[in-house]
């Protein structure tokens, strides 16, 4: 049954990727703020984009579809159905497979926020994703990234907290391959990648602190995360 569910989810997302491949989202809001890999952390006035089954098939009209998605997409492990359905009803969630790029026009975004998505990409896909963020941002635009902090993992290991460290930072799953952590970063490593891509003013910040708007709501991982901001 689990293999069948995995197959359905993968094929559906792949099909969605094909039909949405040329999509470019836009907004009349100013400044233009983009929330990538957002899950259900959607904010009004932002372009909220996710590559999930929920973003692809969530329905404003038919709640029975959302109930099916709620279980199939695994959201029942993290959210109540009321919370899940409320996000869909607001129509604030857009679909795009972010492995394929960032679906906004070049030099169009003032702010890009991305929390706990980058670690789910392998090394090459992660670099391409960051290249796409650079392309999408206006000159002077701000990128804020949250990822598990690999230095925190090293500290856990040195304290003998090996099992907890493996679960947090080297997470794998039998349910859906995308939920696995495929690449990890500390600040020195991520800073070097960002600077090589052309980003400037790369700084490490703390939970809910920084220039990025909306982080009092968007930042949801206070304990083991690294928050980095940089500019184009």
Feature roles, as predicted:
Residues 1-31:
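Class I SAM-dependent methyltransferase Rossmann-like catalytic core
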Residues 25, 85, 103-104, 194:
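Structural motif
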Residues 30-101:
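Class I SAM-dependent methyltransferase SAM/SAH-binding core
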Residues 34, 49, 115, 145-148:
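Active-site flanking residues adjacent to catalytic metal/cofactor-binding acidic residues
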Residues 73, 96, 101, 122-231:
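S-adenosyl-L-methionine-dependent methyltransferase catalytic module, highlighting the catalytic core
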Residues 88, 107, 197-200:
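Structured loop/turn residues at beta-strand edges in well-structured enzyme cores
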Residues 96-112:
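A short acidic, Gly/Pro-enriched loop at the edge of an enzyme's catalytic core
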Residues 110-124:
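A short SAM/SAH-binding and catalytic strip from SAM-dependent methyltransferases
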């Amino acid at each position: 049954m689990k293999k069948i569910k995995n197959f359905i989810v993968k094929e559906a997302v792949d099909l969605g990727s094909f039909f949405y491949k040329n999509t470019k989202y836009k907004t009349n809001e100013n400044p233009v703020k983009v929330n990538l890999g957002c899950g259900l952390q959607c904010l009004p006035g932002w372009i909220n984009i996710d590559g999930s089954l929920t973003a692809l098939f969530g329905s404003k009209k038919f709640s029975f579809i959302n109930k099916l998605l709620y279980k199939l997409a695994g959201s029942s492990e993290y959210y109540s159905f009321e919370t899940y359905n409320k996000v869909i009803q607001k129509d604030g969630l857009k679909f795009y497979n972010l492995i394929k790029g960032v679906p906004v026009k070049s030099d169009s975004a003032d702010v890009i926020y991305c929390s706990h998505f980058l670690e789910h990409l392998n090394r090459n896909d992660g670099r391409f994703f960051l290249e796409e963020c650079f392309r999408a941002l206006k000159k002077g635009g701000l990128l804020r990234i949250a990822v598990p902090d690999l230095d925190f993992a090293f500290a856990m290991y040195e304290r003998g907290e090996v099992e907890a460290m493996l679960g947090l930072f080297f997470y794998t799953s039998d349910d859906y391959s995308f939920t696995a952590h495929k690449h990890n970063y500390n600040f020195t490593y991520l800073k070097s990648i960002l600077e090589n891509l052309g980003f400037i003013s790369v700084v490490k910040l703390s939970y809910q602190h920084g220039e990025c708007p909306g982080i009092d709501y968007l930042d949801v991982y206070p304990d083991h995360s690294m928050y980095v901001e940089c500019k184009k």
